[in-house]
């Protein structure tokens, strides 16, 4: 099919919605490449814990090229400013081949940072603010964060450290006039994968059990043995938080499993809250039922491309 006037197709959805196999099948159909929008899959060696599922990028024996996966070492604190830079590099590489890039992921902050069309600026540390917030609980910090109207909110913020950093960024933006930087205004077709809540919960639990069977605990122990500090792994949240606490003896296996399962369910709910927030902020998201056959989902996107 002829390429439309869109600059980008974005496939977004909560964890366990099947967005990656969908994006890969679509990329195969359109003969293009994928740019990941996942804040943790950028780390090398953090595979099971981030749910990379790299086999999803092979369609009928053909490897679909992907970008922004395995680009940083564990322990490094990659940020949204670097993501914007690296996204543009990948985007321009794909466009130079005459292809329509497919952006795929569930990290709302990363998705919105490139779909919004303005460059974010690095925010310095505010030690005074950090001291002031140090004694607050995650719940109190989340309440503070939810009062802000701009890009950051509670998605991807499941540790106190991340919440404080997000508040630090919001405070800086509130007090510092931000001139909008050069960033391409991308005309994006945004497709959301809508999965039934109960089905999503079933898939999350099943997937968690499978990844534990596949060696997710051993992956965390290996990272610790390689010298990654426990606090640095805990910083990444979710699987790495709970599995590290289990690996260093701060939790029993049952406590780890129950706590992690609950945290992933809550995370998926926050992802959907973010995507609904994007719609309120003016983004048009075309939702497709996750349970549809793959061919129907691909045809749904093709139809949207033709409608432009």
From Swiss-Prot:
Q: Which positions does UniProt annotate for ATP binding? A: 13-20
Q: Which InterPro entries match?
A: Dimethylallyltransferase, IPT, P-loop_NTPase
Record bears the keyword Metal-binding: no
Give residue numbers for the site Interaction with substrate tRNA: 107
E.C. number, please? 2.5.1.75
Q: Which cofactor does it need?
A: Mg(2+)
- Which sites bind substrate? 15-20
A GO molecular function annotation here is:
ATP binding
Protein name in UniProt: tRNA dimethylallyltransferase 2
């Amino acid at each position: 099919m002829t390429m439309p006037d869109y600059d980008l197709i974005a496939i977004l959805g909560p964890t366990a919605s099947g967005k990656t196999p969908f994006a890969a099948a679509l990329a195969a159909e359109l003969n293009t490449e994928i740019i990941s929008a996942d804040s943790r899959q950028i780390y090398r060696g953090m595979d099971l814990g981030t749910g990379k599922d790299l086999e999803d990028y092979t369609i009928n024996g053909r490897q679909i090229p992907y970008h922004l996966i395995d680009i940083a070492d564990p322990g490094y604190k990659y940020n949204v400013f670097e993501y914007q830079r690296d996204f543009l590099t990948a985007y321009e590489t794909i466009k130079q081949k005459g292809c329509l890039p497919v952006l795929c992921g569930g990290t709302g902050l990363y998705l919105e940072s490139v779909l919004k069309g303005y460059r974010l600026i690095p925010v310095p540390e505010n030690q005074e603010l950090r001291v002031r917030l140090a004694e607050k609980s995650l719940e109190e910090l989340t309440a503070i964060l939810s009062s802000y109207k701009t890009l950051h909110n509670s998605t991807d913020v499941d540790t106190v450290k991340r919440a404080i950093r997000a508040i630090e960024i919001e405070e800086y933006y509130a007090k510092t006039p931000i001139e909008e930087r050069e960033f391409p205004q991308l005309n994006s077709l945004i497709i959301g994968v809508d999965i039934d809540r109960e089905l999503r919960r079933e898939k999350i639990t099943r997937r968690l059990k499978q990844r534990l069977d596949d060696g997710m605990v051993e992956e965390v122990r290996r990272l610790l043995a390689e010298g990654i500090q426990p606090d640095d792994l805990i910083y990444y949240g979710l699987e790495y938080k709970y599995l590290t606490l289990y690996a260093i003896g701060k939790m029993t296996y049952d406590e780890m499993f129950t706590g992690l399962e609950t945290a992933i369910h809550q995370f998926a709910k926050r992802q959907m809250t973010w995507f609904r927030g994007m719609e309120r902020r003016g983004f048009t998201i075309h939702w497709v039922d996750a349970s549809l056959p793959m061919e129907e989902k691909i045809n749904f996107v093709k139809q949207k491309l033709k409608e432009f």
